[in-house]
Regions:
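Short functional hotspots at interaction and active-site rims
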Residues: 1-211
Length: 211
């Protein structure tokens, strides 16, 4: 029989309606800059597409598991992408570097960042710098990637660069991702303008079902 409604879905719907929608309306009117922030961790490993055949196939796979980390900030309206990258790990300092980078753009309007609930993004260090730079941070509820616009961009990049692709060297792997990210505002603009619309699905009608 059906159980109770998912409380996290209610939180997502509430934040979308009371916070995101008004902020994005201001952004559309040119009164505010809204950036969606998230980190993607690209690992040099096989990313297989779909394949059906009668015989077993052996596919080339790169050795090692080197990572190329990208912390990105996606402008909700222009779809401009600003990044901090490394090959180690993303932490609070990475977020601070990104805040500084955007602050130095000297945008003549209030700036709001939409971030997920990762601990390094909501720590004291990040909050202190944001207050110092007069930047607003909006932390999304746990498990609500549907409200973070940049998640769609990461899926697009993986499809373009990783699925069913083989890279023998980490440098080639990294260059392919970097090249794709640099073309988001040019070669891929039409596709991304269609993908990155400000429509956010929530699941407030979902129920747990006991089978």
């Amino acid at each position: 029989s059906p159980g109770t409604k998912n409380g996290k879905s209610d939180m997502s719907s509430y934040l979308r309606d009371t916070t995101l929608v008004p902020l994005l309306k201001e952004a559309e009117e040119g009164k505010r800059a809204v950036f969606f922030i998230d980190a993607a961790h690209f690992v040099l490993a096989p990313f297989l597409g779909y394949l059906w055949c009668f015989t077993r196939l052996f596919l080339k796979a790169p050795s090692g598991r080197q990572r190329f980390n990208v912390l990105g900030a996606l402008n909700a309206i222009t779809h401009e992408l600003i990044t901090i990258t490394n090959e180690t790990y993303i932490n609070a300092q990475s977020v601070c570097d990104l805040l500084w980078k955007i602050s130095r753009l000297n945008l003549s309007m209030p700036i709001t960042f939409i971030l997920d609930n990762a601990r390094y993004q909501r720590c004291t260090t990040v909050n202190t710098l944001a207050a110092q730079l007069n930047l607003e941070l909006i932390i999304l509820p746990p498990y609500s990637p549907n409200l973070n616009l940049i998640e769609r961009l990461w899926k697009f990049v993986k499809k373009q660069c990783l699925y069913s692709k083989y890279y023998s060297e980490f440098a080639n792997f990294k260059n392919a991702i970097t090249d794709c990210l640099q073309k988001t505002h040019s070669n891929y603009k039409r596709e991304l303008d269609s993908l990155l619309t400000l429509n956010f699905q929530t699941f407030n009608k979902s129920h747990f079902v006991n089978l």
